[in-house]
Swiss-Prot record:
Anthranilate 2 binds at residue 170. Mg(2+) 1 binds at residues 96, 230. GO terms for biological process: L-tryptophan biosynthetic process. Belongs to the anthranilate phosphoribosyltransferase family. This is Anthranilate phosphoribosyltransferase.
Length: 343
């Protein structure tokens, strides 16, 4: 028996779970535009207030994947998504975007799923455009980019057209809802491996278990205890790791990898252009905090991509990729490849 939106709302008010099949049904109504904006707003707010469960999030992500314009990648060995939920309020340069270039230079295939900045001064789409990358690609062009350069950027609005049905509701509500945590769970290229940064410590255990239910292979969900949705240099980082179907939760520290713990304050930027400059300096092997945090995150991404057997081994590969100039070359490679599709 399907649940009505009114029954679902009542369930959230009573702090009771919406079951898997019911959540699938409700989410399909929202994505098709068959639920009124008032009911959609009430339900997603109700879910937020009662706190979304692992089952509810997994069901919602399943439907969002159903409605996505997919990127078909033939060989998914060492294939990883590097993504953050955003919303951490740290306003740093685009660490995960810089990480993509280093990971690709060290042998991973990266499908980065991202958007323009909402809470940040510069989203991944903004900084890639500032670098000269054409982000407006069709799914088959993204697949070609991954095959040719080892990197593909999927601009979220191009791959999730059904999101336009809920976008006005989200905009008007102006508060975090389940949709803020669905983005990183709905990679249109279905990368089996992932490094995912989250904006709240509670999400570490939740998101890694959602990915477990969604059938992912090797995932590291991270939260820097200084509030960053990245592996942090300024504090310990909480990690939820899914590997071989098993979940482990632990903490890592910069010192574990021979790195100094330093404040992330110097990584703040005010614009996409400032982010571009800092990203290029890090990839250009300029000594400093930016290079170190990119190295740390790239090492973690290479471990999640199974290119490296440990984070420590990944960090060494990342250092080599930056020092050799290969990471910086990857920027020019992606710009050249994507510009041929300029419309």
């Amino acid at each position: 028996m399907t649940i009505t939106p009114q029954e679902a709302l009542q369930r959230t008010i009573e702090h009771r779970e919406i079951f898997h099949d019911e959540m699938l049904h409700l989410m399909r109504l929202i994505m098709r535009g068959d639920m009124s904006p008032v009911m959609a707003a009430a339900i997603i707010t109700g879910l937020r207030v009662k706190k979304e469960t692992i089952g509810e999030i997994a069901a919602a992500a399943t439907v969002m994947r159903e409605f996505a314009r997919r990127v078909e990648v033939e060989d998914n060995a060492n294939f990883v998504d590097i993504v953050g939920t955003g919303g951490d309020g740290s306003h740093t340069f685009n660490i995960s975007t810089a990480t993509m270039f280093v990971a690709a230079a060290a042998g991973a295939k990266v499908a980065k799923h991202g958007n323009r900045g909402v809470s940040s001064k510069s989203g991944s789409a903004d900084v890639l455009e500032a670098l000269g990358v054409n982000i407006d690609l069709q799914p088959e062009q993204v697949a070609a980019s991954i095959a040719e350069t080892g990197m593909g950027f999927m601009f979220a609005p191009n791959h999730h057209p059904a999101m336009r049905n809920i976008a006005p509701v989200r905009r008007e509500l102006g508060v975090r809802t389940i949709f803020n945590i669905l983005g990183p769970l709905t990679n249109p290229a279905d990368a089996p491996n992932q490094l995912m940064g989250v904006f709240h410590p509670d999400l570490v255990g939740i998101q890694v278990r959602v990915m477990q239910r969604l059938g992912a292979q090797h995932v590291l969900v991270v939260y820097g205890k200084d509030g960053m949705d990245e592996v942090s240099l300024g504090a310990a980082t909480l990690v939820g790791e899914l590997r071989d179907g098993e979940v482990r939760e632990y903490e890592i520290h910069p010192e574990d990898f021979g790195m100094q713990m330093v404040s992330n304050r110097t990584l703040k930027v005010e614009s996409a252009d400032e982010s571009r400059v800092m990203l290029l300096e890090a990839l250009g092997n300029k000594p400093g905090v930016a290079r170190e945090i990119v190295t740390l995150n790239a090492g973690t991404a290479l471990y999640s991509a199974d290119v490296a057997g440990s984070i420590a081994d990944g960090i060494q590969l990342a250092r080599d990729a930056i020092a050799s100039g290969r990471a910086r070359e990857k920027v020019d490679e992606l710009v050249r490849f994507t510009q041929q599709f300029k419309r």
